[in-house]
Amino acid sequence: YFSKLQEEPYRIEILRPDNLIAGTSLTPTTKDENPDDNFSTDTYTVGRYFEVTDHPIMYAKPDTTSFDVQGMKVLLDVYSPTGKFSAQDIKPGIEKMISAQKKFLGDINDTEKYAILLYLSDLQKKDARGFGALEHHTSTTVVLPETMQKAQLDESMKDVVSHEFFHIVTPLSVHSNEIHYFDYNDPKMSQHLWMYEGVTEYFANLFQINQGLISNQDFYDRMSEKIASSMNFDDTVPFTVMSENILTDQYKDSYYNVYQKGALIGMALDIRLRELSDGKIGILDLMKKLSKKYGKDKPFNDEDLIGDIVALTYPEIQSFFDQYVTGETPIPYNQFFAKVGLEEKSSMINTGYFLNGQVPYIDGDPASGELFFRKGIGFNTFLEKLGVEGGDIIKTVNGTEYTIKNVYGLITSSQSWEEGSDIEIVVDRDGEEITLTAKASQPQVEETSITEMELPADSPKVKLREAWLKN
């Protein structure tokens, strides 16, 4: 932005048509209306440039609602181009979720006003395609396709907004100098994405079991899925090294693992803290202590954080970080699960040839229309037998050419392949055309599930589990 003016106050005037209103957590200092020309001017004043970037504003035709949760006013603004959804449609699920989050967080969150800005994209037009959300201190912006069904939209909002709301804790309240003085032109990354994104993602799941929104098994299944996803990445790379270098070519493709193994680091640390404190202290208590020590206006030095965590908790926590966060040792999940009376069990389950449930093994290039096998994921037994590699471009399957336009034909035809029939897939691998052949066979993948051990109700492990999930 304007050079060397990051710490100066800003006054922003926005001229808007009268039929559009602002959705934002900012309160306008003035609002000048001119009924003669059907335009009005909203004026906002903030203390420094960061506050400009930290307060998104969405102007749209009025579709807003609000509710109060334990002293916090929540604003919900929705833009739905065809009018398929309204703020009132979405309000019940959001209100239930944020009420549970506020109860879970307790006194760590003193935000007085919070805005949720939902932009629903029209896929029939040249509209937004980057779906997801971005957190701010007092608001979250969300972009999702309007084509979603109501139940699907509610579920996405629950998962996405809950994650973003928990960013109130970190990095918004607890963060390093790299975050506080972030230079968008020359970004320097922190070592602690395990906390900023990993712990946040863990909280977004933990609060749901803690507040009774999901069952114990639902929570275990989510953690199991994260373990499986994390195994598609190098499990020996120190997480702090990856985090600090996440923008480099070597590590940029590992960012998704921040939400997988990062959350699992949070889970393992939570269990270890519960074990050392006889169930009294968990990772939320740690984040409250860090928030009190630092807060949004006092960043920490990157290299000091782990030492501060050890000082605020137990000396034994140092070895946890030395092994599993700054070290190269993979987390022995079974050992941590055993502490709380859980165990992992593996079994083989059936999949489709090109789909594992809702997760595809193939993707498409919108520009070229080409189909290719995805990189960074594990394949089923059939694709492994076939010799498929991530990045292989599909030319033909059993003599038929396939592109994005007829990909569903590929899925459908594969469902009728007979056991033992000959399958031939021609792929382009690094510019070389290769023919892959195999006999059709039921594709399978190994699935690991987390289950509760059969233990008496008064078992110390059961009590520790209850403290971990419900306290």
Q: What positions do the PLM features span?
A:
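Non-catalytic architectural context of zinc metalloproteases
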Residues: Y1-T111, R129-G132
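An active-site-proximal "capping" alpha-helix that borders the catalytic cofactor pocket
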Residues: Q101, M195-F207
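C-terminal recognition in membrane/secretory proteostasis and scaffolding
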Residues: A204-N205, L213-N471
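Juxtacatalytic substrate-recognition/specificity segment
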Residues: D63-H192
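A sensor for short, sequence-defined functional sites
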Residues: Q6-I14, E146, T248, M267
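Active-site metal-coordination segments of metallo-dependent hydrolases
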Residues: M189-E197, Y256-V258
